[in-house]
Design a protein with these regions (language model features):
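PRY/SPRY (B30.2) beta-sandwich protein-interaction domains
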Residues: 1-213
Length: 213
């Protein structure tokens, strides 16, 4: 049997980021699938194959089981490092910034779609989090544009990062190919850059993390 193929937007002129099965911590128990876009982890997770030190980048991740921490990390650090790391644990409504924790909204549900936008162009580099089409503004997910972001360190390369907040959570990333695992996005959002297909509107000025972006 030939099976069912999943369409990809990758081509010789542009390749989107995936999770990197080689960029993991010793002893981690990770299972990658769907072109390294789906991950079941019982360790320190994984990071994106691509990173940048300038530009504005957007990605989505669907948490098939709640308990995944997602965000961004300084790629010059070890994956286990707290420095240069910003992760959101939706199930516990907790934001981890360089190892310190703070409450962040209310708990999410399994199959919610997390939106992550990192701005590496502004004078103060920042990362923003949204859920199911609404951006967090410090008190609620109720705005069409990201703001009140978490500050990142300057002059370094950042990539996207996922980790386990509980035992063996599952996450399906969409870096622009338009799928969560083997399920296509249900309604493509707007994307002025024209690079990548996402469930929700890509914020103005942002694009997919890819070799063209």
């Amino acid at each position: 049997s030939s099976g069912t193929l999943t369409q990809t937007e990758d081509c010789p002129s542009n390749v989107f980021a995936t999770l990197n099965p080689l960029d993991v911590d010793t002893g981690s128990s990770n299972t990658f699938s769907n072109g390294n876009l789906s991950l079941v982890t019982n360790g320190n997770g994984s990071r994106s194959t691509l990173a940048a030190n300038s530009g504005k980048f957007y990605a989505e991740v669907k948490m098939s089981t709640n308990g995944v921490m997602n965000g961004v990390q300084d790629m010059s650090k070890r994956i286990t490092a707290n420095t240069g790391t910003v992760l959101l644990l939706p199930s516990g409504a907790t934001l981890y910034v360089a190892g310190s924790t703070t409450s962040y909204g209310s708990a999410w549900s399994a199959n919610d779609i997390m939106q992550i936008a990192m701005d590496l162009d502004s004078a103060t580099k920042k990362v923003y989090f949204g859920k199911d089409g609404q951006w967090w503004n410090g008190s609620a997910f109720a705005n069409a544009t990201p703001h009140t972001g978490t500050t990142l360190s300057d002059d370094t390369f950042y990539g996207f990062r996922c980790d386990s907040g509980v035992a063996t959570p599952t996450s399906d990333w969409n870096f622009g190919n338009g799928f969560f695992g083997t399920t296509a996005i249900s309604s493509e959002g707007s994307n002025a850059s024209g690079i990548g297909k996402f469930e929700y509107d890509v914020p103005a000025g942002y694009t997919a993390l890819s070799t063209k972006g």
